[in-house]
């Protein structure tokens, strides 16, 4: 019986790309992993290093360096290429440089005949995901950004430390921009199935000091707290990429907060922003529309308006 070989390409083998590749190899997410970088020798070195670690895993992944031409048969192309923000910059400040890089990258990939799924981590990821959708001409369900997947994970981690509950028992999402203007849909955050707002109301003596706005800010600024200490972040986002790729190949139907192009969902059109979505073998099967409160709707709309203002600077 013929079995389809799962193939992934990673474009950009810096710290994020190499961390993603390491996660993919260790988890055995695909059978072939192609690495592409403007510095080809770096991609070759990363491929060699990853190949040498495979004997210490329970997987067998073929890792090699190549070019855009090799993307033709890839199922997923992950793009991590792009400039890192400098001290004092926001992710949005890197837009101009990132957009120029995407024009070259997407053009090269599509010329190969690629017809799979794009998975983006390059910042500002929401706007870059929208740009890649426009440049590629692929259906909107097959162009996905990491969005607020990592932010939602950070939110659960912060809450778990405050509530002393395993983060995997906490469910909830950050929505909107993967950046400073993101918001949390508190009306849908649960701990063991119980609404967190109800828990805080019933247990004021234990949790009366918890400030929800402070948690939102702490979640949004978590990346910068890491940046101040070690210069950049890569493990979290690398694993987020691997997690989404795994969900695609396994057809898991997992709900993950990703950058998705909206066409009427949440009353929004022609914008890419962080929302929960069901991820399948075909990409985004469905965007999950949460019933937001009036205040949450306002915060979500404000975040999207900020994204729109920046989109205009690159012609969208």
UniProtKB/Swiss-Prot annotation:
The active site is at 178 (proton acceptor). Its EC number is 1.1.1.27. NAD(+) binds at residues 16, 37, 42, 68, 104, 121-123, 146. Its main location: cytoplasm. Beta-D-fructose 1,6-bisphosphate binds at residues 156, 171. Keywords: Allosteric enzyme, Cytoplasm, NAD, Oxidoreductase. Homotetramer. Catalyzes the conversion of lactate to pyruvate. Belongs to the LDH/MDH superfamily. LDH family. PANTHER family: L-2-HYDROXYCARBOXYLATE DEHYDROGENASE (NAD(P)(+)), L-LACTATE DEHYDROGENASE. This is L-lactate dehydrogenase 3. It comes from Bacillus anthracis. The lineage of its organism: Bacteria, Bacillati, Bacillota, Bacilli, Bacillales.
């Amino acid at each position: 019986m013929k079995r389809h070989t799962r193939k992934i390409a990673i474009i950009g083998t810096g710290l994020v790309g190499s961390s993603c590749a390491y996660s993919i190899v260790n988890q055995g997410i695909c059978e072939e992993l192609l690495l592409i970088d403007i510095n080809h020798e770096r991609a070759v070195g990363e491929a060699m290093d990853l190949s040498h670690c495979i004997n210490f895993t329970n997987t067998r992944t073929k890792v090699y360096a190549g070019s855009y031409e090799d993307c033709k048969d890839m199922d997923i192309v992950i793009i991590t290429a792009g400039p890192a923000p400098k001290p004092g910059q926001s992710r949005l400040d890197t837009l101009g440089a990132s957009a120029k890089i995407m024009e070259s990258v997407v053009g090269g990939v599509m010329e190969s005949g690629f017809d799979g799924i794009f998975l983006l981590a390059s910042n500002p990821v929401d706007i870059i995901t929208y740009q890649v959708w426009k440049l590629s001409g692929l259906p909107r369900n097959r162009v996905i950004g990491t969005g607020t997947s990592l932010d939602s994970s950070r939110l659960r981690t912060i809450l778990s430390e405050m509530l002393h509950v395993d983060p995997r028992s906490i469910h909830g999402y950050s929505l909107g921009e993967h950046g400073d203007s993101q918001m949390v849909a508190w009306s849908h955050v649960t701990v063991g199935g119980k609404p967190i707002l109800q828990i805080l109301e019933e247990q004021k003596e234990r949790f009366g000091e918890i400030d929800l706005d402070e948690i939102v800010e702490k979640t949004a600024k978590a990346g910068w707290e890491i940046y101040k200490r070690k210069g950049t972040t890569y493990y979290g986002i690398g694993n987020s990429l691997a997690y989404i790729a795994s969900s695609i190949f396994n057809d898991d139907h997992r709900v993950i907060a990703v950058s998705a192009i909206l066409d009427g969902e949440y009353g929004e059109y022609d914008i890419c922003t962080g929302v929960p979505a069901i991820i399948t073998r075909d990409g985004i099967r469905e965007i999950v529309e949460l019933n937001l409160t009036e205040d949450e709707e306002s915060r979500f709309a404000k975040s999207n308006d900020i994204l729109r203002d920046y989109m205009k600077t690159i012609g969208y």
